[in-house]
Amino acid sequence: MSALLSLCFVLPLAAPGHGTQGWEPCTDLRPLDILAEVVPSDGATSGIRIVQVHGARGLQLSVAAPRTMSFPASRIFSQCDLFPEEFSIVVTLRVPNLPPKRNEYLLTVVAEESDLLLLGLRLSPAQLHFLFLREDTAGAWQTRVSFRSPALVDGRWHTLVLAVSAGVFSLTTDCGLPVDIMADVPFPATLSVKGARFFVGSRRRAKGLFMGLVRQLVLLPGSDATPRLCPSRNAPLAVLSIPRVLQALTGKPEDNEVLKYPYETNIRVTLGPQPPCTEVEDAQFWFDASRKGLYLCVGNEWVSVLAAKERLDYVEEHQNLSTNSETLGIEVFRIPQVGLFVATANRKATSAVYKWTEEKFVSYQNIPTHQAQAWRHFTIGKKIFLAVANFEPDEKGQEFSVIYKWSHRKLKFTPYQSIATHSARDWEAFEVDGEHFLAVANHREGDNHNIDSVIYKWNPATRLFEANQTIATSGAYDWEFFSVGPYSFLVVANTFNGTSTKVHSHLYIRLLGSFQLFQSFPTFGAADWEVFQIGERIFLAVANSHSYDVEMQVQNDSYVINSVIYELNVTAQAFVKFQDILTCSALDWEFFSVGEDYFLVVANSFDGRTFSVNSIIYRWQGYEGFVAVHSLPTVGCRDWEAFSTTAGAYLIYSSAKEPLSRVLRLRTR
């Protein structure tokens, strides 16, 4: 498995002829400004406009004229027709948003006659793809190297350096640490560009046109451009070469217009709640007093120009939420056009749904359950569901967990489907390639903890979930689904095998239509997994609750043990231990962010003597890892959820020892 790489082969394609001579410098070994080739120095080209955002100027392309931004490859490949085997491409771009499943081309080299894509750089919401044509005796194949890059689609400027050397592909973003990929298929040594054409921001047609801003697009033959750019005081706007028209101020004053200094320019600033941002408000400012931020209307979107950075200052109690009984799990979710809700999984015969009203949760609906352990909210198309994991059998002695469906007419959840489970602890809902799944964590059947947990698949024909795959588990407590690039993973928290809590929890990867074992972790009464991402780094945290073996005498300190954070190591193709954190019978991790800071809060439930133990908030400190910053008094803490409203950010936790859940407000400064 290569977490950040997918190599895709398509059916053999007819390829243009290529030279048979050895490689020689077909271009000058200097930075070749691709943008300057298509934009005159005065900027007078139809089909593009110059836009300034965050103090920097970029080009915005028009759907009407993709061919305008193109030129023949022979213009820069003057000596021969071979693309260099070693090179780097530098791009400075701004992408405000990108709809799901949309792909936009930053650069392509296309054979004029056959319309073959010889080389391309393509952006999707979560990945940057480098495409090239590879030939052998069987024909020609298009190959794709994909880098995970969700941080690019944030409305800010970023400078990327893609360096290629045979089978090694490297991507550096904003002078950060490079992401290297060792590909099975190297870049070809003899890629002919005879009769080809460079296209900026498109693949020769309107479909896939790059709709963001591009400021820099440079090809550097023969070497990696990173040392020329980095380090930089302003890494997102590091410059190797940009067109003159983007360096100087654009536009000329009218004959009767007097040039003003910037501080004398008349601008319109709107105060109050967020106003509309349309063509009418284009280039106007809005000051948000509540967030202390200044925003500029650009292309139907308010772009932050100046904003105070939020930092977590302290945590204060906001609401004591009385529940029907002790609460074993909580689920916060939103229903469009209806509001924000929290579902509580209560120990006794009734669980509840609460609605956020006037800055607090109020009772909305009671639902009969049987020692409910967890709720899971999910959607399929326009359908909204809520699944409960029941731990005990019903009045007839039958064990069922129930899926409820939201009624848009009644504005309530109504029973939809019952599924036979065995002391269910958790549901996990996920989607893979457009198909919907539910995984149940079956904890035990009678006294037997070594039983199968089940993955169910939605059948669009019957509109029901049907058993799709069984996985052997040992006292399963939690499932967690996540994706890395094109790969889908499912990790289970195994708690007890009948004799010991020292059992392995397993990570599964989906291959050929089913989940297969990928990696095993030594765990101690594992109760929860939490996956999260910081920048390009992917982490997996396990909550260890108890170190116990039937052959050993119970000790109080067996609850005070390390929980572990693992980090994905792409080279090793595995998660490796990143940090140990001492916890007290930890039952849950919750990851959240405030401004530019990242946090983890742990649900500490028992220290061997008392259930009144502090749960801890940890802040990400870079190379130091997570460091404790806040201590929160809790009683039998079982579950944490983070959520936000227009009024601010909050945490809510459930107690397994008292009929009270608490809502905490995160105060920022």
Swiss-Prot record:
UniProt-reported outcome of changing residue 576 to F: In ECTD14; uncertain significance
Function in brief: Plays a critical role in tooth and hair follicle morphogenesis through regulation of the Notch signaling pathway. May play a role in development or function of the auditory system.
Keyword DNA damage: no
Main localization of the protein described in the UniProt heading: secreted
Lineage: Eukaryota, Metazoa, Chordata, Craniata, Vertebrata
Ranges of the EAR repeats in the UniProt entry: 313-358, 360-408, 412-460, 464-506, 514-570, 574-622, 625-668
Disorder this protein is connected to according to its UniProt record: Deafness, autosomal recessive, 98: A form of non-syndromic sensorineural hearing loss with prelingual onset. Sensorineural deafness results from damage to the neural receptors of the inner ear, the nerve pathways to the brain, or the area of the brain that receives sound information. Ectodermal dysplasia 14, hair/tooth type with or without hypohidrosis: A form of ectodermal dysplasia, a disorder due to abnormal development of two or more ectodermal structures. ECTD14 is an autosomal recessive form characterized by scalp hypotrichosis, hypodontia, and mild facial dysmorphism. Some patients have decreased sweating.
GO terms for cellular component: cell surface; ciliary membrane; extracellular region; stereocilium
Subcellular location: Secreted; Cell surface; Cell projection, Stereocilium
Effect of residue 618 to N: In ECTD14; uncertain significance
Domain Laminin G-like per the UniProt entry, residue ranges: 58-277
The protein's name in its UniProt record: Thrombospondin-type laminin G domain and EAR repeat-containing protein
Signal peptide bounds: 1-19
Effect of residue 525 to D: In ECTD14; uncertain significance
Hydrolase among keywords: no
Keywords: Cell projection, Deafness, Disease variant, Ectodermal dysplasia, Glycoprotein, Hearing, Non-syndromic deafness, Repeat, Secreted, Signal
Gene name in the database record: TSPEAR
Glycosylation sites: 320, 468, 497, 556, 569
GO BP term, pick one: tooth mineralization
Outcome following mutation: residue 178 to L: In DFNB98; uncertain significance
Phenotypic consequence of residue 585 to I: In ECTD14; uncertain significance
